[in-house]
Amino acid sequence: MSDLTSAASVLAAALAVGLAAIGPGIGQGTAAGSAVEGIARQPEAEGKIRGTLLLSLAFMEALTIYGLVVALVLLFANPFVK
């Protein structure tokens, strides 16, 4: 593996994990804040709001896991190296 390809792969892996964590992190914070506000306004709808929140948090967390998978592929099974 050439030095330039190796350095670019490490940089791309770091960017993949970093950017994949920032977006869902902001989204999860916004969703949790909105859920707390909704439960405060309508306490009787807590179960429905909580279920929807947990499902949406799982989908958001999947985006972070996809970024981690991309980073691991770039580090250990690099398709750009012959």
UniProtKB/Swiss-Prot annotation:
Q: Which GO terms describe its molecular function?
A: lipid binding; proton-transporting ATP synthase activity, rotational mechanism
Which Pfam families does this entry report, sorted A to Z? ATP-synt_C
Highest taxon of the lineage = Eukaryota
Question: What residue intervals traverse the membrane?
Answer: 7-27, 57-77
Question: What are the annotated GO cellular component locations?
Answer: organellar chromatophore thylakoid membrane; plasma membrane; plastid; proton-transporting ATP synthase complex; proton-transporting two-sector ATPase complex, proton-transporting domain
Q: Which PROSITE patterns match?
A: ATPASE_C
Membrane topology, as annotated: Multi-pass membrane protein
Cellular location(s): Plastid, Organellar chromatophore thylakoid membrane
Where exactly is the site Reversibly protonated during proton transport? E61
Tell me yes or no: is Ribosomal protein among this UniProt entry's keywords. Answer: no
- Its main localization is plastid
Say if the entry is tagged with keyword Lyase.
no
Coiled-coil stretches are none
Q: Which InterPro entries would you find in this protein's record?
A: ATP_synth_csu_bac/chlpt, ATP_synth_F0_csu, ATP_synth_F0_csu_DDCD_BS, ATP_synth_F0_csu_sf, ATPase_proteolipid_c-like_dom, F/V-ATP_Csub_sf
**Keywords per UniProt:** ATP synthesis, CF(0), Hydrogen ion transport, Ion transport, Lipid-binding, Membrane, Organellar chromatophore, Plastid, Thylakoid, Transmembrane, Transmembrane helix, Transport
Q: How does it assemble?
A: F-type ATPases have 2 components, F(1) - the catalytic core - and F(0) - the membrane proton channel. F(1) has five subunits: alpha(3), beta(3), gamma(1), delta(1), epsilon(1). F(0) has four main subunits: a(1), b(1), b'(1) and c(10-14). The alpha and beta chains form an alternating ring which encloses part of the gamma chain. F(1) is attached to F(0) by a central stalk formed by the gamma and epsilon chains, while a peripheral stalk is formed by the delta, b and b' chains.
What this chain does, per the entry, is described as: F(1)F(0) ATP synthase produces ATP from ADP in the presence of a proton or sodium gradient. F-type ATPases consist of two structural domains, F(1) containing the extramembraneous catalytic core and F(0) containing the membrane proton channel, linked together by a central stalk and a peripheral stalk. During catalysis, ATP synthesis in the catalytic domain of F(1) is coupled via a rotary mechanism of the central stalk subunits to proton translocation. Key component of the F(0) channel; it plays a direct role in translocation across the membrane. A homomeric c-ring of between 10-14 subunits forms the central stalk rotor element with the F(1) delta and epsilon subunits.
Family recorded in the similarity comment: Belongs to the ATPase C chain family.
This protein's name: ATP synthase subunit C, organellar chromatophore
Organism encoding this protein: Paulinella chromatophora
Gene name of this polypeptide = atpE
